[in-house]
């Protein structure tokens, strides 16, 4: 029997064959498939020892499945592709081991027994059975959102995966298998069992299985080097949200905070637990919303009777804290979008309640028309939250673009580098949002609010004007840029003079003093660049006679250095030659014709008249001469 290269630690051959096999399976090429079979048949140094039971069998279970999953579809969540890979790899292993299930016409079931454990590929065969069933279950889980009936099939495939994992664990209990493989098999079985109990919502059994899996992987991680422990620690991090979710459903109310932190760290949208986690957080906020009856904003308290608005306002502080603690810009942007989406939903709910309230206001007394209703004031508050969040998001994007602009990396053809025009557009949107804030109903008489918004408007106008000046510098319009820099200093000085009494409103805004320092340095650089550009333009004017595209044949009398004459594009003569004017052909007029005398024709006319009728008749009968 042909032996295969062993996988790491006595069993790397299975992992290697899987990666190579996946390439052939996905590519579909004949040569790739031949390479896979050759890899399965490659002999290993320890195969004879395994046959004689002198060495222990070893299989890096977690490493094999992680590498196979990343290389064959799971990086993009394509479980169907991974299931196809598992089937193809199973078929190759059975063919290599001569362990076929009958022939084309008849199926003969065979099970891997302890007596067959002469090669670690028999363990790999059972592992691929479990992985194939698990990947099919995960594929059905994705489809079960639109087709609930598929959930029954999902549970069936998970049970089958657990059955194969238990068979793998039973085989690994043999004395021929080393201790590390035994522990990995136990952890793998516990993980799949926990997944099955989790889907059945048997929270206590699920948390016991997940804790067992976590304990084994933590022990394995502490027993090996840091490089080998990375995979085990990653698996522990994957299991932790499931454990906390089960703990919450058992009755641990403190688990909800840890789940929200896990959602923040993971990005919130990845993993099969994401939907249940979002539903759990919404459900928890809904329970807390029952105790919330009013909200206070800018000295006025308004009742909150709409459940959707209550849920949004309760989660507002958590969302803002999550944005502050976000580690990456992608996570921060996603949280901003999520918060804006929730705010829009809350605003829509208030608008639906405002429609009948607006009809009642039409019949209200004129004396009461000066004060907006509580519902309208609540709408203004939610609009303020939405616009303020949009301003913060655009300001955060502008800071990122500004950092990229200052780095001045070389331009890449595949990725467009940021330009000052991009920042100008963002600050235009911010200023538009500030104008909308000034027009909110119920805040017309709030002088403090109006002053704060006016101050913020000056700050963002200064930054917008600064980047407009930067765009003029790029096209070497020095005078326009200098005027705009002066305008920036004017705005910044106004903010500094009026911002002393409103320091609280400026604490979240960009530093104006830093902008003033930067503008002053930019003005010095601009003036120096303008002087250099003037000298360059003067030199260009003096040398412009060389580059007037006059051919050499027309300027023999003047000497000038023209480097283009020694190139293949030398301008020597006009070719094709240009057209030159020539005299036209003269015109001749026959003026002598008027003075020519022609002979008389009277005698001929008389002869023709004499013939008359007789001549005509003779002509008919053919007697005319």
Swiss-Prot record:
It comes from Mus musculus (Mouse). Component of the signal recognition particle (SRP) complex, a ribonucleoprotein complex that mediates the cotranslational targeting of secretory and membrane proteins to the endoplasmic reticulum (ER). The SRP complex interacts with the signal sequence in nascent secretory and membrane proteins and directs them to the membrane of the ER. The SRP complex targets the ribosome-nascent chain complex to the SRP receptor (SR), which is anchored in the ER, where SR compaction and GTPase rearrangement drive cotranslational protein translocation into the ER. The gene is Srp68. Residues 33-42 have a biased composition (Basic and acidic residues). Residues 8-32 have a biased composition (Gly residues). Belongs to the SRP68 family. It is found in: Cytoplasm; Nucleus, Nucleolus; Endoplasmic reticulum. This is Signal recognition particle subunit SRP68. Residues 51-251 are annotated as: RNA-binding. Heterodimer with SRP72. SRP68/SRP72 heterodimer formation is stabilized by the presence of 7SL RNA. Component of a signal recognition particle (SRP) complex that consists of a 7SL RNA molecule of 300 nucleotides and six protein subunits: SRP72, SRP68, SRP54, SRP19, SRP14 and SRP9. Within the SRP complex, interacts (via C-terminus) with SRP72 (via N-terminus).
